[in-house]
Amino acid sequence: MFDVLMYLFETYIHTEAELRVDQDKLEQDLTDAGFDREDIYNALLWLEKLADYQEGLAEPMQLASDPLSMRIYTPEECERLDASCRGFLLFLEQIQVLNLETREMVIERVLALDTAEFDLEDLKWVILMVLFNIPGCENAYQQMEELLFEVNEGMLH
């Protein structure tokens, strides 16, 4: 499922391709690309839930409104988000790429992923997908994109 999301993000969203794609055509394109129908369905459902935030149909759980409060992760969240992922989320809050609300959106979308393995690089892409889809987060998206690509470019040299 995560592979389908990455493919969609890189092919349709990140490349600024036509964003209004017929769902049947999209499903066929993904099938032709070799993705499993169940993974396609789950990825599209995941994106649909993300779009609910964009349209104001869903709101992330608000655990605290005090920016100085500390987020305590549940055992399920700790299982999916290791210490490096949780530390990265805290770092993004401290540099104001994420706020309390967008952090909770990211965590909720991470937990909704149907994947056995999840690491820091995967988290970075989920953060990009969430920020891309939330109105008013354009600057945060740009900062996150710069963080992601600066680090990856630095690894190539």
From Swiss-Prot:
Superkingdom of the organism of origin: Bacteria
Pfam families in alphabetical order: DUF494
Record InterPro entries: Smg
Similarity section: Belongs to the Smg family.
Protein name: Protein Smg
